[in-house]
Amino acid sequence: MRIVTIANQKGGAGKTTTVMNLASIIAENSRVLVADVDPQKSSAWWADRAGEDLPFDVVDDTNPANLSRLRELPYDVVLVDTPGSLEGRDVLATILTESDFVILPTEPSPLAFAPLIATINEIVLPSKVTYRVMLNKIDPRVPIELG
């Protein structure tokens, strides 16, 4: 089993959208669980609206004791949707100790960089879990300067 956490302290960074899209794609060949640990329960909200047609399961739970048992569940991949703040540090700390990989979605905006860097420095690096930053909300009409 692989546990992949989608995290960024900035709200609106695209965490839930990333989780739900990845779950849909991965579910084509694997048993997928989305674990919504965000108190706003955005992934659970999406799942409720989709009804019975989702090709993956969704559970919302912020209890650290339950999160530490994710590997006992019968899934190939667990995708974890996290809160857009660092208020639930105990939940984030628990889930990162269980995670194999962290994806940090962010938009290419100066206002997005400070929360991203804070998330990496304060939460991800201390956990020693492998991570990558994923740029989203990119407008292909805007030229990118590589330097």
PLM regions and their residue ranges:
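Conserved catalytic-core segment of NTP-binding enzymes
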Residues: E28, P83-G147
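P-loop/Walker-type NTP enzyme "switch/lid" segment
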Residues: I3-Q9, A13, M20-T94
